[in-house]
């Protein structure tokens, strides 16, 4: 067999052993995909004893390409919600997540200065302590730029030493915070549900009868409240007739309007229009019907709803829009993206025409456009290779192969489409590419660092590195957790999701979800902070490397 064939076979063996290890669980918590790293260490240990060598160039390419696949698909997945998460309700949670990252970086700086740990070792410990694999890849790249030899193997070894407590430390922090503040989980859930009306709610509907005489004869668009686009009127009942109103529809006393919006916005509209009545209009009478259709037609991607012309041509109203699992109130200026789910209302004989314009080709949702994938990867690698010169720094700062594809993917996923190219990726395809990428990356890291792992653990500084990792994991989480609970009165279940999301750690999320099953509160805060946390985790080791290098 050729060297390349042997290398690929060994990688497959590492993946099998590692994924098997990752499935082991203690009280529902396991290493998950991180088991591949330890699979590589085990295989490398026996290879080292028998003097077996692998093709270094093949390993290097597979490691870098796996990292690129992983961070790019992460960016595509979280991109649509990334910028929204930085605003409104997500601002507080993301601020706390940023504090955890900053405190982790400060912990690294303190350890580096106090105990005099080598730069490659402390960055490897940092990546393992925060259980973030792309952080490891970013750190390895910047150390290579700085000319530090053997950075890949030593960083990987230190990462493996710190990784297990990185997972356990998050769970311990959740438990200690619950113990210190004597938290009762059932009460926390009730308080969250009570307060959730002040946050971003899911959309609801209400039927309101027009009793305000000042509205008689006005156009629908002229009624105060419809101009701010927070509420949509999808149906109008006048006597026994139900129709789809337009912005120019004239309103009369005793008309019944079917409104869609958030609870607080609907309450304000009731004060203006009249009284709420119990009259079911969801089951449409006459020739009106409603449908949920998916945007799949490349010709409408990026178009604003008002430019579709489906209301003027066919009398069809878009009452709701679901994008990446988030329900939105559609406005005339809302631009459509591939995969948007629209709730439309119209006449039976014309709703099909509107559907044909928008697409609704379900099979397209399972297809992957490969051209945008490679365009995005190529642009990401180019961006990651652009040097940014900062006065006083010994080397130019680069986003690298971890940061470049991530930033480009976030931007492209937010844009959604350019012409007929769209950056939507089916969840199953995204997950498959992401898992393949991280398995390849961790397998190579394990093989490169496994040769001296056992010796370092038994005879070297392995136990010291574990202690440093515990410090980096535990201190930032506990400080932020106490601040969030004591001073910001953050709900405990949201806090658990925040801690897991700031460490981008799925096993910790599984533990947080199990604290109060079916509530979904922890998962909500995890998803809110995950995009920014992932970005900061990738950038922080690069900044730390340069700052510590200049301080040497």
From Swiss-Prot:
Chief site of localization: membrane
GO biological process per UniProt: potassium ion transport
Topological category with respect to the lipid bilayer: Multi-pass membrane protein
RCK C-terminal domain sequence ranges: 190-275, 277-360
Keywords: Cell membrane, Membrane, Repeat, Transmembrane, Transmembrane helix, Transport
Annotated InterPro entries: AAE_transporter (IPR050144), RCK_C (IPR006037), RCK_C_sf (IPR036721), Transpt_YidE_put (IPR023018), YidE_YbjL (IPR006512)
TM helices/strands, residue ranges: 4-24, 28-48, 67-87, 95-115, 157-177, 370-390, 402-424, 438-458, 463-483, 495-515, 529-549
A Pfam family it matches: Asp-Al_Ex
Record-level Gene Ontology MF annotations: monoatomic cation transmembrane transporter activity
Single GO cellular component term: plasma membrane
Compartments in which it is found: Cell membrane
Family: Belongs to the AAE transporter (TC 2.A.81) family. YidE subfamily.
PANTHER family, alphabetized: K(+)_H(+) ANTIPORTER SUBUNIT KHTT, TRANSPORT PROTEIN YIDE-RELATED
NCBIfam families: PRK03818.1, YidE_YbjL_dupl
Name this polypeptide is given: Putative transport protein HSM_0534
Organism field: Histophilus somni (strain 2336)
Lineage, opening ranks: Bacteria, Pseudomonadati, Pseudomonadota, Gammaproteobacteria, Pasteurellales
């Amino acid at each position: 067999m050729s060297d390349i064939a042997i290398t690929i076979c060994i990688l497959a063996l590492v993946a099998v052993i590692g994924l098997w290890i990752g499935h082991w669980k203690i009280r529902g918590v396991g290493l998950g995909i991180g088991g591949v790293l330890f699979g590589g260490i085990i295989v490398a240990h026996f290879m080292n004893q028998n003097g077996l060598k692998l093709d270094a160039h093949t390993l290097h390419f597979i490691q870098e390409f796996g990292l690129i696949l992983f961070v790019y698909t992460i960016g595509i997945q979280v991109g649509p919600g990334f910028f929204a998460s930085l605003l409104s309700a997500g601002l507080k949670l993301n601020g706390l997540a940023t504090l955890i990252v900053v405190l982790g970086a400060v912990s690294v700086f303190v350890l580096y200065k106090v105990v005099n740990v080598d730069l490659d070792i402390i960055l490897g410990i940092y990546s393992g302590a925060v259980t973030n694999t792309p952080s490891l890849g970013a750190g390895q790249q910047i150390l290579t730029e700085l000319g530090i030899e053997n950075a890949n193997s030593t960083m990987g070894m230190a990462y493996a030493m710190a990784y297990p407590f990185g997972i356990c430390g998050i769970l311990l922090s959740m438990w200690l915070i619950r113990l210190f503040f004597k938290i009762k989980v059932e009460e926390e859930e009730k308080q969250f549900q009570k307060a959730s009306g002040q946050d971003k709610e899911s959309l609801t509907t209400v039927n309101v009868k027009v009793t305000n005489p000042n509205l008689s004869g006005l156009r629908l668009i002229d009624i105060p409240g419809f101009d701010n686009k927070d509420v949509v009127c999808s149906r109008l009942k006048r006597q026994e007739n139900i129709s789809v109103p337009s912005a120019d529809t004239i309103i009369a006393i005793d008309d019944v309007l079917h409104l869609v919006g958030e609870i607080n916005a609907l309450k304000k509209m009731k004060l203006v229009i009249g009284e709420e009545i119990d009259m079911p209009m969801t089951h449409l009478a006459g020739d009106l019907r409603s449908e949920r259709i998916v945007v799949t037609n490349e010709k409408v991607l990026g178009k604003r709803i008002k430019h579709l012309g489906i209301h003027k041509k066919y009398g069809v109203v878009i009452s709701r829009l679901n994008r990446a699992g988030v329900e939105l109130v559609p406005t005339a200026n809302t631009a459509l993206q591939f995969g948007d789910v629209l709730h439309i209302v119209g006449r039976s004989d014309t709703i099909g025409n509107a559907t044909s314009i928008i697409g609704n080709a379900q099979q397209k949702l399972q297809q992957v456009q490969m051209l945008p994938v490679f365009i995005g990867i190529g642009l990401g690698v180019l961006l990651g290779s652009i040097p940014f010169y900062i006065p006083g720094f010994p080397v130019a700062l680069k986003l690298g192969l971890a940061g470049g594809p991530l930033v480009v993917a976030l931007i492209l996923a937010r844009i959604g489409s350019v012409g007929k190219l769209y950056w939507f990726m089916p969840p199953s395809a995204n997950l498959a590419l992401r898992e393949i990428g991280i398995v390849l990356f961790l397998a190579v890291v394990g093989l490169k660092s496994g040769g001296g792992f056992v010796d370092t653990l038994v005879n070297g500084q392995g136990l010291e590195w574990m202690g440093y990792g515990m410090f980096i994991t535990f201190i930032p989480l506990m400080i932020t957790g106490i601040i969030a609970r004591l001073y910001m009165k953050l709900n405990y279940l949201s806090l658990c999701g925040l801690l897991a999301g700031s460490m981008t750690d799925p096993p910790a999320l599984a533990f947080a979800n199990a604290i109060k099953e079916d509530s979904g509160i922890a998962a909500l805060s995890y998803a809110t902070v995950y995009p920014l946390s992932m970005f900061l985790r990738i950038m922080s080791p690069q900044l730390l490397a340069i700052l510590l290098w200049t301080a040497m």
